[in-house]
Amino acid sequence: MRYALIASMLGQAAISVAMPSEPAHSPRAAGAQAYASNQAGNYKLTSIAAPVQGNGSPGPSTWNLSIDDTSSGYKQKIVGFGAAVTDATVSAFNELSASTLSQLLDELMTGAGASFSLMRHTIGASDLSGDPAYTYDDNGGNADPGMTGFNLGDRGTAMATMLAQMKGLNSNLQIFGSPWSAPGWMKLNNAIDGNTNNNNLNDGYLTNNGAQYSAAFAQYFVKYIQAFESHGATINAITLQNEPLNSQAGYPTMYMFSYEQGDLIQNYVAPALKAAGLSTKIWAYDHNTDQPDFPEQVMGIAADDVSAVAWHCYATNLDWTVLTNFHNSYPNTDQYMTECWTPSTGAWNQAASFTMGPLQNWARGVAAWTLGTTAQDGPHLSSGGCGTCTGLVTINNGQYTFQTAYYMMAQFSKFMPVGATVLSGTGSYTYSGSGGVQSVASLNPDGTRTVVIENTFGNDIYIHLSTSSGQEWSGNVPTNSVTTWVLPAV
């Protein structure tokens, strides 16, 4: 849960940077290329000296990396990178003129900028919604198991419309939705907001009074998916509950047990989607890496109906190798990093690290929290809203600014296209408190290879890269930067 961990996650201040410097030429052009974004802000997807074959001219600090770009090194295929489209995002973006919004979306969704192809969105209100909190079937607090009062409302319609615009710019875009709470009338506490007692779905799991609203909960997803599709926003996947182990008060939350989630998926939500002719996939969990038993227990019940597991970054002792352990147990189940915040006071490389770590450990995609906010980190709920959640993009006085986190994520998304295959590699290491080098590589559909290198040392590092295909590449990686090499096809 992001708020309890603010103090432990803050670091050096992020820099606010303006429009991106476009690479001088296409990342798919002949020959090796290199692009960098850094803490200082003078590199923003900037073309720098490309690596050369052989040893080159090593500097005083060198580091060896290796990748297996043969079939024996193939790992997961990339689905994409992006962020959460929240009510705050939609509201902030819609402050822009039509022409400025068009330019912004083009930079987010196409090769003109980040080429984002994975977007999460909030089903109803989240902590990054303006007052009041809402769902798509509040019905005045009255029970509505037949969903006769279902309505996206102005905010849901605006969100669906914006997601459809994004899909129109990038046909590869995958959209997944997550609710922060079921409608209050479906819950034991009869409220959208969380609390310490009865902040649970009224599905009989705690009360032994029958399924109650389990079927209605499933139909809520069906209605929402159909409504968004009617606006041109296809929903590719859902999670049943954002942060199911979070029952925090002050904003929409809902506690959900692992066995409860497994039962809901197997006996209600999956059958309802199938009966409605929907191909939307179900992702389990959607919470931190410190409770891996939760998704494992869900898989024990509903493995046939779960296509992926979703993870967040807020564990006190964050360890992305949990994803590798899960992969070893469930090699046919996809994994995604679906939420990590990007506060303006966070470490410069925070977004790079929460993208790098999951990719090294079998994640097929990464989504930050959140895509866009105002310069005041909102709009957000007045009670319990996140007042320090800065978007990858901030909107102020009719203009937009890309934050450091945007560039860090774009170092991956722009150069690791949909369908790229992540490669196994060696040489990544971070010293406790004194920097290090982390890397991840991919074999792209056109045969080129991408190597993303994160240097957290206070000096440049000369990288020597060996490939299993028999090549040697060398080049400089600037201090406190994320640098991407694009190597030609073998």
From Swiss-Prot:
Temperature optimum or stability note: Optimum temperature is 50 degrees Celsius. After 30 minutes incubation at 50 degrees Celsius in the absence of substrate 50% of activity is lost.
Keyword Phosphoprotein assigned: no
GO biological process, one term: polysaccharide metabolic process
EC class name: hydrolase
Alphabetized Pfam families for the sequence: Glyco_hydro_30, Glyco_hydro_30C
Enzyme Commission number, as recorded: 3.2.1.75
Main location class: secreted
Keyword Signal: yes
UniProt-annotated location(s): Secreted, Extracellular space
Active site residues per record: E243 (proton donor), E339 (nucleophile)
InterPro entries named among the record's database cross-references: GH30_C, Glyco_hydro_30, Glyco_hydro_30_TIM-barrel, Glyco_hydro_b, Glycoside_hydrolase_SF
GO molecular function, one term: glucan endo-1,6-beta-glucosidase activity
Signal peptide boundaries: 1-28
Catalysed reactions, as listed in the record: Random hydrolysis of (1->6)-linkages in (1->6)-beta-D-glucans
Keywords: Glycosidase, Hydrolase, Secreted, Signal
GO cellular component: a single term: extracellular region
Induction record: By fungal cell walls.
pH dependence: Optimum pH is 5.0. At least 20% of maximum activity is retained between pH 4.0 and 7.0.
Similarity-based family: Belongs to the glycosyl hydrolase 30 family.
Function: Has highest activity on the linear beta-1,6-glucan pustulan. Lower activity against yeast glucan and laminarin (beta-1,3-glucans with beta-1,6-branches). No activity on colloidal chitin, pachyman, starch, cellulose, nigeran, dextran or gentobiose.
Protein name (database record): Endo-1,6-beta-D-glucanase BGN16.3
Source species of the chain: Trichoderma harzianum (Hypocrea lixii)
